[in-house]
Amino acid sequence: MMMMTSLGGGAGGGGGGGGSGGGRFVTYPPPLSVPPSAPQSPNFSGGLRSQPSFLVEQEKYLSELLAERHKLTPFLPVLPHVCRLMNQEILRVTTLLENALSQSRFDHPSPLASGGIFQNSRADMNGWASQFPSERSVSSSPAPNWLNSPGSSSGLIVKRTIRVDIPVDKYPNYNFVGRLLGPRGNSLKRVEASTDCRVLIRGRGSIKDPIKEDMMRGKPGYEHLNEPLHILVEAELPIEIVDARLMQAREILDDLLTPVEETHDFYKKQQLRELALLNGSLREEGSPMSGSISPYNSLGMKRAKTRG
């Protein structure tokens, strides 16, 4: 339904005059509504929706968003606002999904939350899908969300890189790479999307296949394979915020690189829960969920093969 608002008559604002020119109407379009495919919170005025049905709808919508974001990757430099809005919607949906999956977030904060990314949200964005090429890096660059940030008026964009060492010498049997990547590389993807930094795992052990790593060692572009396992964090941002974003990413990574006893590792439990959800094997309160609801099983999305 269209809405009409009456604007006052003459400059004096006075009434008077019986003519029809005493006022004018401006027609407004109806407020934007969320598309039918965009699921809301499981709590509606009509009652509580079934948890499994809600999760399936959420994951289906999320897979559509992820597929569209993947298609937008080549256009990030020319469509920054669109990409920023897309990231915000992905965050909204993953927040709802995470709230539905876990009721104990406050008791077990994730490293992402402690890093200050989601200070006003209970979610750590479990549910993102990603595609990552060689050396365990995430493929798509994060969409800039700093366009309207205060203090970015200088227009000077700088590129900076920091290195974060992985303590494999102290904990040789700890699976740091798996903890960093998460299911389908989602955990690393969330760090990238939330900090506007690119995160790459480099060094010995950064290629999944040891035989392939031995083959690539010494070749151009793979010199890092002679170094200990480490992380490179790259940021190309306005000079006013680039250091803050790099430090934000470093703080999150430091948390992820702190070994936790498996029985108390809530973050790993959430990763396993996410993997079960993506594989379609998650069971909520005894309610069966048939079929896979992985984002890769819809819209023709395929997992990217790695060179390593």
UniProtKB/Swiss-Prot annotation:
Gene3D superfamilies named in the record: K Homology domain, type 1
Domain of life of the source: Eukaryota
Modified residues (Phosphoserine): 294
Keyword check for Nucleus: yes
Region (Disordered): 1-26, 284-308
A Pfam entry, by short name: STAR_dimer
Keyword check for Nucleus: yes
Start and end residues of each KH domain: 165-232
Compositionally skewed regions (Gly residues) per UniProt: 7-24
UniProt keyword list: Nucleus, Phosphoprotein, RNA-binding
Localization (cell): Nucleus
Listed SUPFAM superfamilies: Eukaryotic type KH-domain (KH-domain type I)
An annotated GO cellular component: nucleus
GO molecular function: RNA binding
Annotated protein name in UniProt: KH domain-containing protein At4g26480
Lineage, highest ranks first: Eukaryota, Viridiplantae, Streptophyta, Embryophyta, Tracheophyta
